[in-house]
Swiss-Prot record:
It comes from Methanosphaerula palustris (strain ATCC BAA-1556 / DSM 19958 / E1-9c). It comes from the Archaea. It holds the Pfam family ATP-synt_ab_N. PROSITE patterns: ATPASE_ALPHA_BETA (PS00152). Has multiple subunits with at least A(3), B(3), C, D, E, F, H, I and proteolipid K(x). The keyword ATP-binding does not apply. Keywords: ATP synthesis, Cell membrane, Hydrogen ion transport, Ion transport, Membrane, Transport. This is A-type ATP synthase subunit B. GO terms for biological process: proton motive force-driven plasma membrane ATP synthesis. Component of the A-type ATP synthase that produces ATP from ADP in the presence of a proton gradient across the membrane. The B chain is a regulatory subunit. The gene is atpB.
Length: 464
């Protein structure tokens, strides 16, 4: 292994090295300090006479006389079934006090986006136990469905609840969760670890924790380690894997930080111009492959700076993914948990995973009717603020009351409350029964006769 002593410049986490031989992109590098200590890095960029290396830890102690060895290998993740139940650092090292992972394979962390021709269409419903997701913005196996949140909102709690409760109802196949947190505080890391251990969810999970004081470079690697692990569990072991990535905003900030250190020409709001491509290289690793048993489903979580849904991170994520779940500051102020606003939320693949043979025949109609009724009631709140409640017609008051009922009964649920899809749909019918039957214009008459509490109870009484 040839050793160079031609370090030209050090800038933040980057080391610039003069070279005379071809060096591979993303090649692993060992930097040897004067005392023999070795720091690892990766080739970020290469030109005719210069190589840019990003160091996985601080560059403290690296000098122009330090030795640089190019290994000729890329980063590989040691993977195996024994990873389930383990908590790892953002660089894939065990931090739970357990033994080192004995790898069954070592896989390149860059992976590969699934060939579009090899993709199978998502069609299986994933039950999260949260009514606003299951009932109105359904998650489908193989989908990538982000959560858009804001600073100070309980997206971490929502992420933990999904990680704990997610399952494919009626399936006998194994289900696993890969949870990767990026740029979190030590307090948040402790909270995540304690909740996984308290609830027993850790048994079927692999957890990666990258802390805020860890190098920015590690934040770029963490989601790739998580997705490589998920792909192994899904496509080698045949498991259904849900990958939760939080917080993608911290990931993008790390991209911006490294881009600034490389003196790149910035794009929108200082983020690199290639951020769209970079995010796509992560999100497109979700899906189902024809002929394979397993699947990878993604829920990336991001905090929108200033609650701005047009911010580049949210904007680009929305282009690549298949919908969004929006966490509302207004609902959070009302003390409602989980504060998911169904009106701007959307699951583009919802119709593929609901209905007869998937959830229940009335699912789509109930969802559409609740959405329409809540939207109308929510609009009436603005009118009430101007003209007062007394100026409303009897019909309008009914819809206004439905909006309050929807938020307090359907949206609101406990942190440990796990509702089945049947519970969610039955609750939806219960709320819709507060509206006159003639106002249920989006539901077929035969479904009303079968599921509406008024007719359902009357039918049961007649049978007796």
């Amino acid at each position: 292994m040839k050793e160079y002593r031609t370090i030209n410049k050090i800038a933040g986490p980057l080391v610039f090295i003069e070279k005379t031989e071809p060096i591979g992109y993303e090649e692993l590098v060992n930097i040897v300090l004067y005392d023999g200590t070795i720091k690892r890095g990766q080739v970020l960029d290469t030109s005719d006479d210069l190589v840019v290396v990003q160091v996985f830890e601080t560059t403290t102690g690296i000098g122009k006389d330090s030795g640089v060895r190019f290994t000729g290998e890329t980063i590989k993740m040691p993977v195996g079934r024994d990873m389930l139940g383990r908590i790892l650092s953002g660089s894939g090292k065990p931090i739970d006090g357990g033994p080192e992972i004995v790898p069954e394979k070592r896989l390149d962390i860059t992976g590969a986006a699934i060939n579009p021709y090899a993709r199978a269409s998502p069609s299986d419903f994933i039950e999260t136990g949260i009514s606003t997701i299951d009932g109105t913005n359904t998650l489908v196996r193989g989908q990538k469905l982000p959560i858009f949140s804001g600073a100070g909102l309980p997206h971490n709690n929502v992420a933990l609840q999904i990680a704990r409760q997610a399952k494919v109802p009626g399936s006998t196949e194994e289900f696993a969760v890969v949870f990767a947190a990026m740029g979190i505080t030590q307090e948040e890391a402790n909270y995540f670890m304690q909740d996984f251990e308290r609830t027993g969810a850790l048994e079927r999970a692999v957890v990666f924790l990258n802390l805020a004081d860890d190098p920015a470079v590690e934040r770029i690697i963490t989601p790739r380690l998580a997705l490589t692990t998920a792909e192994y569990l899904a496509f080698e072991l045949g498991m259904h894997v849900l990958v939760i990535l939080t917080d993608m905003t911290n990931y993008c900030e790390a991209l911006r930080q490294i881009g600034a250190a490389r003196e790149e020409v910035p794009g929108r709001r200082g983020y690199p111009g290639y951020m769209y491509t970079d995010l796509a290289s992560l999100y497109e690793r979700a899906g189902i492959i024809k002929g394979q048993k397993g699947s990878v489903t993604q829920i990336p979580i991001l905090t929108m700076p200033g609650d701005d849904i047009t911010h580049p991170i949210a904007d680009l994520t929305g282009y690549i993914t298949e919908g969004q779940i929006v966490i509302s500051r207004e609902l959070h102020r009302k003390g409602i948990y989980p504060p998911i606003n169904v009106l701007p939320s959307l699951s583009r693949l919802m119709n593929l995973g609901i209905g007869k043979g998937h959830t229940r025949e009335d699912h789509k109609k109930v969802s559409d009717q609740m959405y329409a009724a809540y939207a109308e009631g929510n609009d009436l709140r603005g009118l009430v603020a101007i003209v007062g409640k007394d100026a409303l017609s009897e019909r309008d008051r009914t819809f206004l009351e439905f909006a309050d009922l929807f938020e307090n009964r359907f949206v609101r649920q406990g942190f440990d409350e796990d509702r089945t899809i049947a519970d969610t749909l039955d609750l939806g019918w219960e709320l819709l029964s507060s509206l006159p039957v003639e106002q249920l214009t989006r539901i077929d008459r035969d479904l009303i006769a079968k599921y509406h509490p008024q007719f359902k109870n009357a039918g049961a009484a007649q049978k007796r």
